[in-house]
Amino acid sequence: MRVEDFDFELPEELIAQTPLVDRTASRLMVVTPGSNEVEHQHFAHVLEELRTGDCLVLNDTRVLPARLMGVKEETGAHIEVLLLKQLPGTDEWETLVKPAKRVKVGTVITFGDGLLTATCTGELDHGGRTFEFHYDGIFFEILEQLGEMPLPPYIREKLEDKDRYQTVYAKERGSAAAPTAGLHFTEELLEQVKAKGVEVVFITLHVGLGTFRPVSVDSIENHEMHAEFYSVTEEAADTINRVKRNGGKIIAVGTTSTRTLETIGSKYDGEVRAEQGWTSIFIYPGYTFTVVDGLITNFHLPKSTLVMLVSTLATRETILSAYQQAVEEKYRFFSFGDAMFIRPKE
């Protein structure tokens, strides 16, 4: 299939620059796979779509305030360092650096008046560098103090409250971007979901910057995804499998939860097992879902791998029709935007 098959017109003013004050006040478009009829609701309506005996699966990753602004010790030049991945058991990180040409192996960068320093230990592709960090105390506490949220490139407004780019259940540190479908949930709404007899399960996938990487090939079959770390506990796997056995539907919150479940389910004939690892699964039309029945997701970029994923669950024609209606009705798009509920097939 061609990348162009997933293109649509999107006026720039529909890209949400700031989050709404009330997380559940976002609009919700309800989509039935194979149909061009949609329902326009508000997000709290998701409670009506979930049924007793279903299972809601959420990604509990926590976004790191991974953008650090520092100065080159030697010259005082300003350097931006974006943390991507910690090398296991070390104080070394893979990073993206701007401007990369000013940073060579051995370069020392200082952050926060010396609260944190970093020495470049290696050069990677595309402006990447490895750094070893030096500090007194706990690294992640210093990062919370000095770091900024790595907002997507299409958001140009400064985020006043870091917590608005975290889900209310964010727990496991490690993401370079938020699992944005989960931003709509409040603790109160999750309690109402549980009270209805819906199982609420948490899994983890650390979202990488590859989530914003454009598809640069003409044929989608030739696109390669960046690998991202995932983890599913035995308790989570057991609950999901029990719900499926009992005829309940598995509703994934976000494309990250979807990709995690399908990574595992596609290996074990639809069974979810406790495991952790790295996934580069790319879901596009032609793929058969093994675990996920329904999906809560935001509105995504034209020609993105995320539009391809939702088109696989709901059909391409249904999604492109829904997106056209979303533009006409002035829905808010992307990370801080509105949501879509793709109903399970009956």
UniProtKB/Swiss-Prot annotation:
Primary role: Transfers and isomerizes the ribose moiety from AdoMet to the 7-aminomethyl group of 7-deazaguanine (preQ1-tRNA) to give epoxyqueuosine (oQ-tRNA).
Lineage of the organism: Bacteria, Bacillati, Bacillota, Bacilli, Bacillales
Cellular compartment(s): Cytoplasm
MF GO annotations: S-adenosylmethionine:tRNA ribosyltransferase-isomerase activity
Protein family membership: Belongs to the QueA family.
Gene Ontology CC, one term: cytoplasm
Primary localization: cytoplasm
GO biological process, alphabetically ordered: queuosine biosynthetic process; tRNA wobble guanine modification
Quaternary structure note: Monomer.
Name assigned to this protein: S-adenosylmethionine:tRNA ribosyltransferase-isomerase
Keyword Kinase: no
Coiled coil ranges: none
Pfam families assigned to the protein according to its UniProt record, in alphabetical order: Queuosine_synth
Annotated organism of origin: Lysinibacillus sphaericus (strain C3-41)
Record EC number: 2.4.99.17
Highest taxon of source: Bacteria
